[in-house]
Each structure stands twice: as structure tokens, then as C-alpha cells.
């Protein structure tokens, strides 16, 4: 499968094993996992970091198998849902960093192209999230106000 704004192929990755239930050696209960997820979220961790901490420190290989819900669903049920989905958040942070870099280095044409690619991906993701009703229809990405968007 090709990457979006290059001619190269992406790296191949491993696939998750097909399972319908949590493994027997994972003994964490749904309540414990929910408590840890909420604590880690309040400390300022992202959903992917929460999943890695649960995997590495608490022996939970898959939150969805253990609880029946994804990390974002657990947060949504406890009124702690993020304003912006994590992949969109990361792209906005990248675009902000590139804009700051280009203010100082305005002749850096390669990173101007990187900024264009990042903002194209942002617009494409916004359109997707609006169609799936994750973001409101009137939600817009504006580079001038992007830093305010990413604060929790």
C-alpha cells in the first residue's frame, strides 16, 4: 500500500492475533482498567500512551478485549472525551511546529512542502470526522487558531 504524499510504500507491520476474548493470564478487571485509564488521562496522557502503559505495566494486552470498550469509549462514558481525535491532534501539533520553523527559516522549501502535506491530511481527516459525526459540521481548521484547538 502506498503512502499518501510520497511514491514510496509504507513499512509493513505485524498484525494482531485474532481473538474474541481476553487471554487467561490477563487478570485485570473492567473496573480496575477503567480506573487506570481515567487516572492516566487526568495525568495528561494520550489514548495510545494509555494503551501502551496498560500493556507494559498492567498486563492488559488489549483494552477492548478486556473491557468490551475502546479507550476513547471508556473516556466518553465518563465524560472525559478528548476535543479532537488523537490522529488529528498529532497532525495539528506537527503543522504548528512546521509553521514555527518556517517563521524563522522562511526559505526552507522542503518543509514548506511538508506543511502543505500535513495540512492536506488535516483537511482530509476533518472531512472524514465530520461525515462520521465525531466533529461538528461547522468545525474548521484554521492555522491561526490551531494552538487553541489542541489544548485540553
Swiss-Prot record:
It comes from the Archaea. Pfam families: Ribosomal_S13_N, Ribosomal_S15. One of its GO terms (biological process) is translation. One of its GO terms (cellular component) is cytosolic small ribosomal subunit. Keywords: Ribonucleoprotein, Ribosomal protein. InterPro entries: Ribosomal_uS15, Ribosomal_uS15_arc_euk, Ribosomal_uS15_N, uS15_NS1_RNA-bd_sf. The keyword Ribosomal protein applies. Residues 11-26 have a biased composition (Polar residues). Residues 1-10 have a biased composition (Basic residues). Residues 1-26 are annotated as: Disordered. GO terms for molecular function: small ribosomal subunit rRNA binding; structural constituent of ribosome. SMART domains: Ribosomal_S13_N, Ribosomal_S15. Belongs to the universal ribosomal protein uS15 family. NCBIfam families: PRK08561.1 (NF006331). Part of the 30S ribosomal subunit. This is Small ribosomal subunit protein uS15.
